[in-house]
A protein has these predicted regions:
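Short glycine-rich substrate-engagement loop in P-loop NTPases that contacts/grips substrate
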Residues: 1-25
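A cross-kingdom feature that marks ATP-driven nucleic-acid transaction machinery
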Residues: 1-3, 216, 221-386
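Conserved ATPase-coupling elements of RecA-like P-loop NTPase cores
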Residues: 4-10, 32-41, 66-67
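Conserved P-loop NTPase "ATPase switch" module shared by AAA+ and STAND
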Residues: 21-37
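Conserved catalytic/switch belt of AAA+ P-loop NTPases
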Residues: 38-56, 60-62, 70
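Short regulatory helix/loop adjacent to the ATP-binding pocket of P-loop NTPases
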Residues: 62-78, 90-95
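Conserved small helical "lid"/interfacial subdomain of P-loop NTPases
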Residues: 83-103
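Interdomain hinge/linker elements that couple catalytic modules in large macromolecular machines
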Residues: 96-261, 265-274, 281, 296
Length: 386
């Protein structure tokens, strides 16, 4: 609905607009520019329940916009289009499915070492791994060499979102003014617990205004969050979500992080937080096609923390610690063991993901710990039955 005549038609006669394709699929791009279509679509669909009549695309979800009078519950399915996964970028022959693979590894009784399950060929060089995380998954900037040309794309993209899309969605120029500063603050934290008071203070706005800006950024798919985990396990865990810029390429651009800076003090810490956001992002992409149903969260109580908790549909969990180093020792899985002991049979797998090039399995006080390269997220083989 970027074209004036199409948008005016949709606004003036939404029923007629929706019926113009007759028995074909009507594709409506940038549908959020005519919010009145939602209620009209409900009426049209109720008269003819054939699936696949409409494909609605846009830079935000039409059905989540304020003022949209119907959710189309039971009549529509929302699919989020993420940036490209690493398996897609590598032209993997079959979609990567890390959660399904790690479950097949842990349930195997015939494999003596995880190395037999894992492809050691073509392991990315440590510097290449850093480059992968910092580049992100947006197709267009990946066509450009790192540096000024790629930075210009990110700069132009964010400027247009702030001055056009944000203003149009919010109906106020205030959002455009604060969107980029907000994203810069979030980018500088990598993936971190959201402390609204601190972020609002840094922006010089109220927490109420910050909540509005965050909701807008989420509707524009610019930020993602994972909830605090612990329901059914403990009441003492932190419930604050962890939040991050949705694409690590955008986050690296906003924070000025490069491969060279990631190797130095200050940049090394930011890269570690960005690596965690990258791993969550890859799991989130795979979640849309995985054979397993799962949710993603984090866990913290007192001095114990689990970077990523993958909870399966049956209540079992995969506990993941992220390390931005090339070597790890038993200290890396200290909290995994502690929490794993309390969870008992609920733990389906305990994993440390790091920047090394070896896939290892350790047995420590009755716990089986898998130490896997970050590249295992997309370079694992097809699951085999044990």
């Amino acid at each position: 609905l970027d074209v004036d005549v199409d948008r005016e038609y949709a606004q003036a006669d939404p029923i007629g607009f929706l019926q113009q394709a007759q028995n074909k699929t009507l594709v409506i791009d940038e549908a959020q520019r005519a919010p009145n279509l939602a209620l009209a679509m409900k009426r049209v669909i109720d008269l003819d329940r054939r699936p696949g009549r409409y494909a609605i695309t846009g830079s935000t979800d039409l059905l989540t916009l304020p003022g949209v009078s119907d959710s189309l519950a039971g009549r529509a399915e929302s699919l989020r289009l993420y940036g490209l996964s690493q398996g897609e970028l590598a032209n993997r022959s079959t979609p990567e499915d890390w959660v399904h693979w790690i479950l097949s590894v842990t349930s195997s009784t015939t494999i003596d070492s995880v190395g037999e399950h894992y492809q050691h060929e073509n392991i990315a060089h440590p510097e290449q791994q850093r480059s992968i995380v910092i580049a992100g998954g947006y197709p267009e900037p990946l066509k450009r060499e790192p540096g000024r040309r790629r930075d210009r794309w990110f700069s132009s993209y964010l400027e247009r979102l702030a001055t056009h899309d944000a203003r149009e969605l919010a109906g106020s120029s205030d959002y455009a003014e604060y969107l980029q500063p907000l994203l810069k603050i979030l980018a500088s934290q990598g993936q971190a617990e959201l402390v609204k008071a601190k972020v609002a203070r840094n922006l010089g706005i109220s927490e109420t205004a910050l909540t509005d800006y965050l909701q807008l950024a989420e509707r524009m798919y610019l930020v993602d969050s994972i909830p605090g985990w612990g329901i059914g396990f403990t009441n003492r865990s932190v419930k604050r979500p962890k939040i991050s810029v949705s694409d690590t390429g955008i986050a690296a651009f906003l924070s000025g992080l490069t491969v060279q800076k990631s190797l130095k003090s200050g940049g090394f810490e930011l890269y570690g937080a960005l690596l965690e956001a990258f791993i969550v992002g890859e799991l989130r992409k795979q979640q849309t096609w995985s054979t397993e149903r799962y949710s993603i969260a984090h866990f913290r109580q007192r001095n114990e923390e689990i970077d990523i908790v993958v909870e399966l549909a049956d209540g079992r969990v995969i506990l993941i610690e992220v390390k931005s180093s090339h070597d790890v020792d038993a200290r890396a899985w200290k909290h995994l063991k502690t929490i794993g002991s309390q969870l008992g049979q609920r733990v389906a797998a305990t994993v440390v993901i790091y920047l090394g090039d070896k896939a290892l399995r350790f047995h420590d006080d009755g716990h089986t710990i898998f130490v896997l390269p970050v590249t295992s997220l997309w370079q694992h083989p097809e699951p085999r039955q044990g």
